[in-house]
Amino acid sequence: MQYLEAKIEDLTDIISLLQDDILGKTRESITKDDFSAYKKAFLAIKKDLNNRLIVVKENDKIIATMQLTIIPYLTFAGGKRLQIEAVRVHSSHRAKGLGQKMIAWAVSFAKKKSCHLVQLTSNKERKEAISFYEKCGFKASHEGFKLYLK
């Protein structure tokens, strides 16, 4: 299994993984117009040195993805935290330990980048994901809020 930075040619497979989700199936699509928006976002992520879009490959096939963002902050006398986003594992590879390996890989990445903590959020509708993150050692220590602008 390989953990690699995503390339533009991986984008269609990444979008498919985003769709293969309780919420993604209604909000993600690969129409021509949508693909242009995904491509623009992908290129912006790649340009940002604090962002990594990771794909997990097995036998040259993408089976999982996640986005990692290093966030510098002033509190605690300054430091960095790693934000984990958009963790998706192909349905045929779920419940086989891959998600735990991905989180361990992300935590190792955070340590190499001298981050003080790793954080993530999960939609409250994703009960299984919340349970999974708790099993990985994450604590529900904060209440998150979002304000959608579009």
Map each language-model feature to its residues.
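A short beta-loop-alpha structural element at the N-terminal edge
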Residues: Q2-S16
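A conserved beta-turn-beta hairpin within the catalytic core of GNAT-like acetyltransferases
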Residues: Y73-I84, R94, S141
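Conserved acetyl-CoA-binding loop-helix of GNAT-fold acetyltransferases
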Residues: A86-V89, A95-S108, K135
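Residue-level recognition of the GNAT/N-acetyltransferase active site
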Residues: H90, N123
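Conserved active-site alpha-helix within GNAT-family acetyltransferase domains
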Residues: Q100, H116, K124-H142, L147
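Conserved GNAT acetyl-CoA-binding A-motif
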Residues: I103, A110-S122
